[in-house]
Amino acid sequence: MQIKQNISLKPYHTFAIEQCSHYLVEVGSVDELVDIYANPDFRELPKLILGSGSNVLFTQPFSGVVVVNRLSGKTLSEDESFYYIHAEGGEDWPNLVEWCVQQGIGGLENLALIPGCAGSAPIQNIGAYGVEFKDVCQYVDILMLDDFSQRRLSAEECQFGYRDSVFKHALYNQCVVIAVGLKLPKTWQANNSYGPLQEIAEHELSPMSIFHKVCEVRREKLPDPKQIGNAGSFFKNPIIDKAHWQQLKAQFPNIVAYPAGEQMKVAAGWLIDQCDFKGVQVGGAQVHPKQALVLTNAQSCTAQDIIQLASLICDAVWDKYQIALEHEVRFISAVGETCLSELRVES
């Protein structure tokens, strides 16, 4: 385990913005995780657990220790009704999904090509095309940072919500996800109700056909972070009450939304697109011309460029629809997590 000093974070997050960390260490075992968090030299320093860095924006140089989760490995078991997959927290999520499909195991195909690591999936309760992580989760293994004990949380204990979980609330900064357990039924049912997936002919429906379709759509609509720096969907799809929805529907008949329990989930990309932000650029930051929900590092942008562009979008959407957008991307300051509203006050 090598502890690096004053290291560039550009290769460690998909926005690929030049920023540095005072310390950085890549850990390949739980013992190494414990060593870092128990190290008296680092005790008072802020720490940030990072997977593939696909959902973060570093707004300042990080003054503490960035801990990169490299825990790897996966195992497969089964009984008469289910497949069970145990994946270490540093396992690449897109590779895990593809591996399952290649094994003939269905259930994860709708979650194909979502960047990130297995350990990040429960924190964010990742989701796409009608499936969320909570739908396939059996358990999440965590390392508690106060006494370094290991716990196994059931899916219910994870308190999953829309892009939300207990790891953002009661367990925030209290633990590290070291592994996840997935439970996938052998009696596979296609989840093809969303948009382009309906184009697949019924006789061709399979985990593999849905996997390929999801990959095709994502590659067509979303920029490859290896080519253009980005963190995927920058904003969450806002959830509003039905009274507000009905007012907007009367004024904007083409508004795109879906039921979310007793409320409505509005397509943030549609809202941003209707405010004419596709292709808009601030400094080196740009709203992707094909997908308004994605902000990109188009030309060696700074974090401030992204912040200013995101602020303009939030203001425009509020002025037109009275909907407050919430960013899905995590903003990381010099000492830890912050948010757009705090940064706007500071600037």
From Swiss-Prot:
It is found in: Cytoplasm. Pathway: Cell wall biogenesis; peptidoglycan biosynthesis. Keywords: Cell cycle, Cell division, Cell shape, Cell wall biogenesis/degradation, Cytoplasm, FAD, Flavoprotein, NADP, Oxidoreductase, Peptidoglycan synthesis. Its main location: cytoplasm. Residues 16-187 form the FAD-binding PCMH-type domain. It is an enzyme of class 1 (oxidoreductase). Its EC number is 1.3.1.98. One of its GO terms (biological process) is cell division. It catalyses: UDP-N-acetyl-alpha-D-muramate + NADP(+) = UDP-N-acetyl-3-O-(1-carboxyvinyl)-alpha-D-glucosamine + NADPH + H(+). The active site is at R163, S233, E328. The keyword Isomerase does not apply. Its cofactor is FAD. Pfam families: FAD_binding_4 (PF01565), MurB_C (PF02873). One of its GO terms (molecular function) is UDP-N-acetylmuramate dehydrogenase activity. One of its GO terms (cellular component) is cytosol. It comes from the Bacteria. Belongs to the MurB family. Cell wall formation. PANTHER family: UDP-N-ACETYLENOLPYRUVOYLGLUCOSAMINE REDUCTASE. This is UDP-N-acetylenolpyruvoylglucosamine reductase. It comes from Vibrio vulnificus (strain YJ016). The lineage of its organism: Bacteria, Pseudomonadati, Pseudomonadota, Gammaproteobacteria, Vibrionales.
